[in-house]
């Protein structure tokens, strides 16, 4: 923690709202919320009440709920936010539709965050007030969970990313699904990828992205251009991407997504 009660994405990174709020929520759940951070939140949002935090986060991220909804769910689970009704809902039911329809639905999250759409949506639904349509929405939960099972890689890590995987595990646990296979595999991934100092990398596999950046940086000084070209071409996806629906031939952050492996790019 920096002197002003804030955090960055890493020890060397400048402070930012997202890292600060998530860390604050974690400490709040343990009864160790720093007073300095409350001052930061007051300066940033005008206060640290439910409305201040919810409106502040939603205004910061705009209409895209890819990050704002999971962040607010964590705050609610930790007790930073007490009124679930004020938090945004996500239409987890839409996940059961054929992927080709997603482009027409104006989903509140980006396509690679469908796991978050499902987990956050189920949690928010189960924590909210019941109404006439609640039984219908409840009936979609098993179907949505089947989609989540299909999207989860063998190692349990969604997109090889600790944040997305942790959000899914947190939300499913909060929704009473802590013993579900998706939750258990997600927890296993987090336990397997934690560093010795207790931290996690933002992503466990950025090999393809880092390789291409290095190639660009080296330019004409690259010693074996032909071999590197072959490696990059080989890392192109060979099948349709299960999250985004992208056609074969594209690249992701990692080289773990191939025609023979189940996982994210």
Q: How should these model regions be labeled?
A:
Residues 1-265:
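Preference for long, amphipathic alpha-helical scaffolds in soluble/luminal domains
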